[in-house]
């Protein structure tokens, strides 16, 4: 993150915009106090550059990018109201940030019913912060590990302040599935079998990557519907 901020700092000094409009720092594996100390410093740097910082407290279960949290104690999978109050006290007033609190959410794919989300954790945490610091203290929350979640859970989190949901696993599958179908249905054209030459039209990457892109776009459209943001922009409804 530091090199990216430095690149943005140089761009801003030249009268340009920052390299990115937002960054994420995941210090959830650290003790909360250490996490917040690092987050405060990064948020201050981001604020100077008009960059939003996304931070995380509480551990999202499962595995992501080779990082496995299966050995983490169960209580670490749930952000407490006290945690949320501490995050507010640590970061309020420094700059614009989003907060990924954890409520049983996990990375990677699980069978339906295997993941037990507790969206009420977000409700309770927001209430604790609001009771102490007022309605303006409510967080803009991020839902990590949203792939495969029940629509009812997704919609419930929206009422508790979720403004962003991550669905990396779902979009990966949406992209890959039609490509697999293409290969299976055109196996003799994709491969050069028994001295045959195959079919360039079927092994041309453009022929199947386009299908992946189209299916991913459909999954993204569904996500917009799930999050009640379809046909909406930051300027209003279209």
What label would you give each PLM region?
Residues 185-238:
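Extended, intrinsically disordered, low-complexity segments
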Residues 90, 178, 182, 226:
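Residues that form generic nucleotide/phosphate-binding pockets
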Residues 1-137, 151, 155-156, 160:
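Alpha/beta enzyme core
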Residues 83-86, 178, 215:
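Exposed alpha-helical structural elements
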Residues 111, 121, 128-208:
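Catalytic-face loop-and-helix region of soluble metabolic enzyme cores
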């Amino acid at each position: 993150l530091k090199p990216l901020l430095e690149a943005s700092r140089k761009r801003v000094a030249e009268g340009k915009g920052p390299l990115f409009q937002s960054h994420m720092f995941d210090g959830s594996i650290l003790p909360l106090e250490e996490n917040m100390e690092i987050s405060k410093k990064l948020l201050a740097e981001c604020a100077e550059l008009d960059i939003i910082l996304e931070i995380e407290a509480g551990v999202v279960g499962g595995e992501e990018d080779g990082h496995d949290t299966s050995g983490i104690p169960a209580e670490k999978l749930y952000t407490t109201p006290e945690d949320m109050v501490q995050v507010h006290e640590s970061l309020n007033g420094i700059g614009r940030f989003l907060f990924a609190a954890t409520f049983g959410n996990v990375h990677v794919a699980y069978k339906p019913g295997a993941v037990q989300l507790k969206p009420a954790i977000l409700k309770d945490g927001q209430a604790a912060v609001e009771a102490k610091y007022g309605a303006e203290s409510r967080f803009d929350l991020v839902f990590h590990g949203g792939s495969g979640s029940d629509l009812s859970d997704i919609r419930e989190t929206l009422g508790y302040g979720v403004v962003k949901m991550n669905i990396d696993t779902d979009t990966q599958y949406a992209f890959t599935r039609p490509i697999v179908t293409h290969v299976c249905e055109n196996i003799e054209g994709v491969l050069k079998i028994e001295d045959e030459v195959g079919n360039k039209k079927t092994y041309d990457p453009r022929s199947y990557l386009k299908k992946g892109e189209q299916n991913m776009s459909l999954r993204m459209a569904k996500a917009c519907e799930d999050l009640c943001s379809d046909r909406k922009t930051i300027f209003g409804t279209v």
